[in-house]
Design a protein with these regions (language model features):
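Mixed-charge (Asp/Glu-Lys/Arg
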Residues: 1-17, 23-145
């Protein structure tokens, strides 16, 4: 939470279905309907392969998050480094076998949460939101024509 922009609102869902935090984005003191889901992971030590941190994820959690219409940020905190790494769900390689229970996801080691450019995240959330709204508005326009 210490790395979040000051004005953002973080809420914890009452039931954990794969959403650990919901973040509402504040820009220039205004909330404009932009939000994202955060899935939190952690470990005592790192698990590095090819300069990427890795962590198991349940396929059911991946599917739940993938079917969600909001942007998903996955964060892994490593206790002995006192550092967290992040990736967007869109950048996670889907499970090779959808029938398996777990699969491995990777976090680029350069994606340190302490160094994240939140403007890049805001811009991506805005792109996704604008596409969804444009699609909905186009469908509504067709239905009312």
């Amino acid at each position: 939470m210490q790395h979040l922009p000051r004005d953002w609102t973080a809420t914890t869902p009452k039931k954990d279905y794969g959403q650990d935090l919901n973040l509402e984005i504040c820009e220039e003191g205004q909330y404009r309907g932009l939000d994202l889901i955060v899935q939190l992971k952690s470990s005592a030590t790192g698990d590095i392969l090819n300069n990427r941190e890795r962590h198991p994820l349940k396929v059911s959690t991946y599917n739940y998050l993938w079917d969600n219409l909001r942007v998903v940020l996955i964060v892994k905190y490593i206790e002995d480094e006192n550092e967290a790494y992040w990736t967007l769900l869109k950048d996670v390689e889907p499970p090779a076998n959808p029938e398996q229970e777990n699969f491995t996801i990777y976090f680029p080691r350069q994606n340190k949460l302490s160094e994240i450019n939140w403007n890049d995240i805001i811009n991506y959330v805005r792109q996704v939101t604008d596409k969804k709204l444009a699609s909905t508005r186009a469908k509504n326009k067709q239905n009312h024509s």
